[in-house]
Regions:
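Microtubule-binding structural modules
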Residues: 1-87, 118-120
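Folded alpha-helical bundle/alpha-solenoid domain cores of large eukaryotic adaptor/scaffold proteins
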Residues: 89-144, 166
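Extended, low-complexity interaction tracts enriched in P/G/S/Q
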Residues: 1-28, 33-42, 140-141, 149, ...
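Short basic/glycine-enriched coil/helix segment immediately N-terminal to the Walker B
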Residues: 103, 208-215
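Generic alpha-helical segment signature
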Residues: 30, 80, 101, 129-132, ...
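Short alpha-helix boundary/capping elements
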Residues: 45, 109-116, 147, 227, ...
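Alpha-helix capping and helix-loop boundary segments enriched in small/acidic/polar residues
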Residues: 75-78, 127, 236
Length: 527
């Protein structure tokens, strides 16, 4: 948020980090997919359901990406029908017209239908879309593409050779992966389109690009430290972010503490404070860190999750924060000792999630749509860009014969995090820790153990320990003088209004020190 010199809000913008696209395809057990799908199924009027090919749908259980987790209702008891109305109001507020809102909903419903598609395999191993599946017709209608183009984009891979385009048929497993890539890319582009529209609605129309001299406030909302029964690439990125911001929090607390002591002229030797730089090096150090090893493996044509795991075990074996036992090696797992505790990760799908390959056919398919809104999503994917480490813009895409290979997700995330930390270092940050009172998401229930664990993970308990070792009681001079001057009445000047509050405090402290030195030990105890 940017403000004028008089404090008036000038404009605002939002930025996203690490969209969890894997949730769209495979939400975890006990977790829901993105709320939008449930809200549409619960809230769309009957007259509109037919337009979105939902006329015969009973509910979330009819669509694979919603049924796979077995969880349909929100744990907090909020009704999807009500939040659907809130959603429509929000879309209108940020500038979506009625037609655009329908097109947005149409894309979401297309993803539901795509999740129900299936493939058949011929005797030669070539795949084809199962045309007997009723979801196919609905998906084609909602996406505005032809059956021929749709089938070719999912079941074939285009190869350019000497100016000629050849098509290679894909296996059923490869076609399924292509469908998942199409769904994730479409959802990602839709998400980015909404973000772009929000930024357009909250930016000042005549705002210049140069905001030098603006007063600004940034609000960073991030996931807390994560440790589940199964932890994957997303948890590594989230915990990497938390490690980096925790280090910044530690340094800021020390810096602020030291500045205050120096300002007051207080001599105090700082106690040791856990430094997690070694964890950050383990994750991001060039050529040696886990993300760097992952990027190197992604460049090897025949790499697998197993080959990545072996390379990581070899390079990280001696790192004090890295551990792996024989049974974990069999599974491709490893452990990192984070500042908040030890977390075990599985390397399964690490390569795929980090590579984030976008089949060239996907962008071409969306761009060929007869529906302008969906064609615009293809354009967003084709022109996707990311910031380079030096702050300049460069294309985040490089072409191969059959796909657009983005800068790896890990590299993009590291760059975003580096830029974010640079911004924070130029500000005066204020930290707000949000704590869950219980794991059941129910009101009126407070679990001290859960709260204590969150405070420990967030580094709050450690910060309190540092404060206690120093001078935890911090009275303003005026408050201290008012409260304790009665102990030094004989020493307080009659015309004390001519003395500063700090001078009065010194008089009180010196008088009490003299009183303690001159009094018998038992008298001091009695006082």
């Amino acid at each position: 948020m940017r403000f004028q010199s008089n404090g008036r809000l000038k404009s605002a913008s939002i930025e996203t980090y690490l969209l969890e696209k894997v949730r769209l395809i495979a939400p975890g057990a006990g977790e829901r997919n993105y709320h939008i799908f449930y809200e549409l199924l619960a809230g769309l009027p009957q007259r509109e359901r037919k337009d979105f090919c939902l006329g015969n749908a009973r509910g979330p259980q009819d669509f694979h990406i919603l049924a796979v987790s077995g969880t349909f209702d929100r744990r907090d008891g909020v009704e999807d029908r009500k939040t659907y109305q809130d959603l429509r109001t929000a879309l209108t507020t940020i500038g979506f017209s009625g037609d655009e809102t329908k097109e947005l909903f149409s894309v979401c419903c297309a993803l539901l239908q795509c999740s129900n598609l299936s493939f058949v395999e011929s005797s030669s191993g070539a795949s084809e879309i199962d045309t007997s599946n009723p979801a196919l017709r609905s998906a084609l209608k909602l996406l505005g593409v032809s059956a021929e183009d749709f089938g070719k984009s999912l079941c074939c891979s285009a190869i350019e050779a000497r100016g000629e385009i050849l098509y290679k048929t894909l296996s059923r497993a490869q076609a399924t992966k292509a469908l998942e890539a199409l769904m994730k890319a479409t959802y990602s582009a839709l998400f980015q389109k909404i973000v772009n529209r929000i930024n357009l609605s909250i930016a000042k129309a005549d705002e210049k690009c140069d905001n030098t001299g603006d007063l600004s406030i940034g609000v960073l909302d991030i996931f807390g430290f994560e440790s589940f029964d199964a932890n994957s690439f997303e948890q590594l990125c989230i915990n990497f972010c938390n490690e980096a911001l925790q280090q910044q929090f530690n340094q800021y607390v020390f810096k602020q503490e030291q500045a205050e002591y120096q300002q007051e002229g207080i001599e105090w030797r700082f106690i040791s404070f856990p430094d997690n730089q070694d964890v950050l090096d383990l994750i991001e150090k060039k050529h040696e860190g886990i993300l760097s090893i992952l990027d190197e493996q992604n460049l090897i044509p025949q790499c697998t999750d197993q080959s990545f795991a072996r390379a990581m075990y070899e390079k990280c074996a001696d790192h004090p924060r890295f551990s792996v036992n024989s049974s974990q090696k069999i599974l491709g797992n490893f452990c990192i000792e984070h500042y908040a505790g030890i977390v075990e990760y599985s390397t399964v799908t690490f390569l795929e999630k980090n590579k984030d390959e976008l089949p060239k056919e996907t962008t071409e398919l969306l761009k060929s749509s007869s529906i302008d809104f969906i064609a615009s999503l293809g354009a967003i994917l084709a022109t996707s860009r990311s910031p380079s480490p030096n702050g300049k813009k460069h294309s985040a895409l490089r072409r191969t014969n059959s796909s657009l290979v983005r800068e790896s997700v890990g590299s993009q995330f590291s760059g975003q995090l580096r830029k974010l930390r640079g911004k924070i270092e130029q500000t005066a940050p204020h930290y707000i820790r949000c704590l869950k009172p219980n794991d059941l998401l129910v009101p009126g229930s407070f679990s001290p153990a859960i709260i204590a664990d969150q405070l420990r993970c967030a580094g709050v308990l450690e910060a309190i320990r540092v404060s206690r070792v120093g001078f935890p009681q911090r009275y303003p001079h005026s408050e201290f003088a008012r409260r304790y001057q009665m102990l030094a009445r004989k020493h307080i000047p009659k015309h004390k209004r001519y003395y500063s509050e700090k001078d009065l405090c010194e008089i009180v402290v010196n008088a009490i020190a003299l009183l303690i030195r001159n009094a018998p030990s038992n008298a001091v105890h009695d006082r």
